Every structure is written in structure tokens, then in C-alpha cells.
């Protein structure tokens, strides 16, 4: 007995992220949208990402490969997480917003709602249920596209970038205080 749920949003995954955040207070009204393509031997791998930070304390990242939800994430999730942490830290360091330490991935992702969608000519999954993408080349592809495009977005939207850094700093301080308590 297989359960199928179908989503259709006029604005694509940007609108989907907006809907997922409807009960939260968004830190920035615009849903950040990033896309890019990289060529591999078998054809093109395209990456699309929509993300928005809110006042929530948890992160919510949904992963898709060729429109199929991968509930256990996979290599696209790894690429996204790495690029997010690096790009937020780079922006913060370049603007001298950090005092010494870098932000952890966990701190950067606090309050994040994101959807990462990969279209791949020949994806590999951990099982037939396609719950987890294991195509190793996808990590680097997602990482490079997200790092580059998110860096550009931060340069063009410094007030949003600063809010994201400040949210990460608050998360870091709270985590540190909890550790010492």
C-alpha cells in the first residue's frame, strides 16, 4: 500500500519553501533561489535550491532527485551543508563579523528551511526505495554551485547575509552556554 503525495506550486520550489515556513516568522521575506548545471560523462546534472531562514530553532531540509523525495537525504544534502557552512563563514570573516571562531554547520543551519532538487541522468540510491542518494559526484557538484551562487547572493544582499550570520552567532552562543551549564 504505497502512499503518493503530489505537490504543485506555481512558483516551484521557492513557493514550496514559502509554504513550509508559513507558520514561522521568516528572517528575510525573499526565498533565496539558486540553480546551476555541471556536466558529467553521462550528461548534465542540474541543481536547484530554495532556502529561507526563520525564527525556528530546528532545520528542515528536503531533498529530491529527479522529482523523487529522498527522505534520508544523501550526497546532495552533504554538498548543501558543506557549501552553506563555508559560504556563511567566508562572508562573516570577510566582513569581520566573527570574533575568532567559525560558525559550526549546526549553527549556520538553525532556523533554515531548504529544498534541494537534483536532476541526474543516472542517479544511484542506497536502496530501491530511493530514500537516499549515493551518487558520489553529486556532493561536489551541489557544493560548488551552492557555494558560488550563495556567495553572489550574499554580496548582492548584505543585510540578509548579516542577519543569517547574526542568527548563527546567537545559535553558537546558546550552544556554548548550554555546554557550560
Per-region residue spans from a language model:
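GHKL-family ATPase ATP-binding module
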Residues: 1-181
Amino acid at each position: 500500500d504505497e502512499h503518493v503525495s503530489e505537490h504543485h506550486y506555481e512558483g516551484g520550489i521557492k513557493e514550496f519553501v514559502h509554504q513550509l515556513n508559513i507558520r514561522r516568522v521568516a528572517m528575510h521575506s525573499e526565498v533565496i533561489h539558486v540553480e546551476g548545471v555541471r556536466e558529467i560523462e553521462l550528461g548534465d546534472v542540474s541543481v536547484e535550491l530554495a532556502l529561507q531562514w526563520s525564527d525556528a530553532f530546528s532545520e528542515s531540509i528536503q531533498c529530491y532527485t529527479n522529482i523523487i523525495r529522498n527522505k534520508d537525504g544523501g550526497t546532495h544534502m552533504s554538498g548543501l551543508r558543506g557549501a552553506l557552512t563555508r559560504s556563511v563563514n567566508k562572508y562573516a570573516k570577510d566582513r569581520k563579523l566573527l570574533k575568532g571562531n567559525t560558525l559550526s554547520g549546526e549553527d549556520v543551519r538553525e532556523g533554515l528551511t531548504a529544498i534541494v532538487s537534483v536532476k541526474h541522468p543516472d542517479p544511484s540510491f542506497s536502496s530501491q526505495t530511493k530514500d537516499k542518494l549515493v551518487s558520489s559526484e553529486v556532493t561536489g557538484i551541489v557544493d560548488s554551485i551552492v557555494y558560488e551562487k550563495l556567495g553572489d547572493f550574499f554580496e548582492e544582499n548584505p543585510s540578509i547575509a548579516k542577519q543569517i550570520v547574526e542568527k548563527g552567532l546567537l545559535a553558537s552562543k546558546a550552544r556554548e552556554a548550554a555546554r557550560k551549564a
